[in-house]
Amino acid sequence: MTIGRHSAVELDPALDDYQLASALVREAGQLALLMRMAGLQSQQKTSVSDIVTAADHAAEAYVLEQLQRCRPEDGILGEEGASVQGSSGRTWVIDPVDGTYNFLHGSTYWCSAIALKDSSDVLLGAIFQPEEDKLWLGGGSRPATLNGQALAVFHDNGGARNSTAVAEFGAATYIHPSWLADPLCAMPWHAAATSAAALRMLGSGSCDLGRVADGQLGCWFQHSCPEWDWLPGKAIVRAAGGATDTVRVNGLEWFMAGGTTAVRELRAALESGSVTT
């Protein structure tokens, strides 16, 4: 198939779900990168840092078309508007370009991500960072991998990393500056942020979560994540042996990932920022 001037691969419906997810994020990411190299303009969504490009739309259109051909009974939900009601009870959740602000400005810290979920939980996740050629995959019965190599960071003699305190880890996070003016958000965020050894705010939640799974980042937290920003990485962190959790504080939902102890301590820190009685 051709999208604009760019050719994309027609995928084989016989691929299993993991193979299909890997191929989809790889092709979507490469398509977006080629379009950026050819020149792009952006449109603002909710803020100056929340933007969308033609590459976001084209990559999502590619994934949508391939899924409708390869998995016609499954539902589809995409960040840029894709919405298909399936009959199988399963739904593919698409983020064609996660980290669009980074993507548009020439950073390598962006990715294409996808998850497959059913009514009970996320089944698998795949994240591809094209400019660093990193593909994280895992979930369900499939242990987490990075470029096909097993991730064992949480499995050291029963999970030594799972017992490491958040104070010994760098934490990845994201918060829009406007939220810092709201005590209902700022207080729990500050409590969690100051509990970590260091902070990293790099601009792509899925890239962050892949690095939690492979050990480059110790833990991660963020509020109000849509499914396409959360489910791919959640599946991979859990498949790597890590922990994930959510907690509601001051009316906001917070999302966490990392080792068991770090996630437990992040949750306690966030809850300590509650201003409700």
Residue spans for each PLM region:
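Short, low-complexity, intrinsically disordered N-terminal peptides in bacterial proteins
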Residues: 1-19, 150, 157, 162-163, ...
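N-terminal subdomain of lithium-sensitive/metallo-dependent phosphomonoesterases centered on the IMPase/IPPase/PAP
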Residues: 1-97
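Residue-level signal for inorganic ion chemistry
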Residues: 32, 56, 67, 100, ...
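Short acidic/glycine-enriched loop/turn segments that link adjacent beta-strands
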Residues: 48, 132, 250-252
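Acidic active-site catalytic centers that drive phospho-/nucleotidyl reactions
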Residues: 56, 79, 95-98, 102, ...
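DPxDG-like acidic metal-binding loop motif
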Residues: 86-147, 171
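Short helix-loop capping/hinge motifs at secondary-structure junctions, enriched
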Residues: 143-146, 150-152, 262-265
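An extended, acidic
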Residues: 157-277
